[in-house]
């Protein structure tokens, strides 16, 4: 008997992503789904909030293949949604107010909860309760629970669902712009090569919690400071600080060059616990320096002294001073560990796939 092969065409899944307004996480998720071949409809609850606040993200989403933005309109919703991603923040009350309309059409729901470690534990649990109450009977369709800023060991959602962090990627400009993407992801650095910059900070001083960390270390980067860690290593220190009100960052190509020339990159938290900087540093072989309680947020298996330096109990000054005492063989060892992470963790296709798996789209 002749055995004929049968070609089964996979049905395109119907994915909708609810947000109050688009932000960097919206792009991270939509782009990861797009490169995985999925069509994504981003249902924006309050489109007027996007004017000026996330214009760049909004534009990048519109230019991303297989992604479309839909202003809140129940008439635009399909009769059935295969996968609904509910991104509760950055404005939880507004997002939840309009979540029932798509939720009652959804076969499966991925909830990205705002009840994470950015809030005190009691407030996080209260927020999770509000989310479940807002979804009502449709909450039983939640099969994936994610957090941007990590989760507590015990919380309400963890009582009945497995929990994961979403993970993060480089800033959208390094994903969306083809030239910058290739520059950021190029494996053109040698783990064994001595670098000319010991440490850098590149970014905004805002918000206040980041400014407090920077106030503790700023003088260590000053070229006339006798306490500068660079004196012990004969390497320079690079500092480029600005405010949100006057956001004058480095040219993206210069930014990549500084990371590529730096042994260490300071990654203090900003408005969220997660920032793009640790991933950007890893991609250029620069060892991230970040808070000890943020190592589990990125989905890249950070380990202190192996592929990063952790800051304990907000002791940023002591940590930066200690960088000058890290010997060159130790720096090369950590950089070699980072290089070994590339294929399965850091390369964009691998990172995007892991995000899709956590969302529930790929196995």
Predicted regions mapped to residue ranges:
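Flexible glycine/serine/alanine-rich "lid" or loop that lines and gates the nucleotide-sugar donor pocket
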Residues: 260-261, 281-283
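Nucleotide-sugar donor-binding catalytic core of glycosyltransferases
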Residues: 5, 10-276, 291-301, 344, ...
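Pol beta-like nucleotidyltransferase catalytic core
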Residues: 200-202, 282-363
């Amino acid at each position: 008997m002749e055995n004929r092969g049968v070609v089964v065409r996979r049905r395109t899944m119907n994915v909708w992503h609810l947000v109050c307004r688009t932000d960097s996480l919206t792009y991270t998720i939509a782009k990861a789904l797009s490169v995985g071949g999925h069509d994504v409809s981003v249902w924006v609850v309050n489109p007027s909030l996007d004017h000026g606040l996330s214009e760049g993200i909004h534009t990048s989403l519109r230019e991303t293949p297989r992604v479309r933005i839909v202003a809140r309109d129940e008439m635009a919703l399909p009769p059935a949604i295969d996968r609904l991603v509910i991104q509760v923040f950055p404005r939880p009350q507004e997002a939840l107010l309009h979540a029932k309309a798509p939720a009652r059409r959804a076969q499966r729901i991925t909830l990205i909860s705002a009840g994470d470690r950015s809030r005190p534990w009691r407030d996080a649990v209260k927020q999770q309760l509000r989310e479940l109450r807002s979804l009502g009977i449709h909450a039983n369709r939640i099969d994936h629970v994610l957090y941007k800023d990590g989760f507590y060991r015990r919380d309400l959602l963890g009582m009945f669902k497995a929990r994961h962090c979403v993970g993060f990627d480089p800033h959208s400009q390094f994903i969306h712009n083809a030239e910058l993407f290739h520059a950021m992801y190029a494996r053109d650095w040698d783990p064994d090569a001595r670098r000319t910059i010991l440490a850098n900070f590149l970014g905004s001083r805002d918000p206040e919690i980041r400014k407090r960390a920077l106030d503790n270390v700023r003088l260590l980067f000053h070229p006339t400071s006798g306490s500068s860690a660079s004196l012990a290593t004969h390497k320079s220190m690079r500092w480029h600080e600005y405010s949100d009100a006057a956001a004058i960052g480095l040219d993206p190509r210069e930014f990549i060059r500084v990371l590529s020339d730096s042994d260490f990159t300071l990654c203090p938290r900003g408005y969220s616990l997660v920032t793009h900087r640790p991933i950007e540093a890893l991609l250029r072989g620069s060892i991230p320096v970040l808070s000890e309680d943020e190592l589990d947020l990125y989905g890249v298996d950070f380990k202190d002294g192996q592929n990063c330096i952790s800051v304990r109990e907000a002791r940023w000054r002591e940590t930066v001073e200690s960088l000058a005492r890290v010997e060159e063989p130790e720096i090369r060892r950590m950089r070699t560990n980072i290089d070994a992470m590339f294929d399965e963790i850091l390369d964009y296709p691998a990172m995007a796939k892991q995000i899709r798996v956590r969302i529930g789209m790929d196995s």
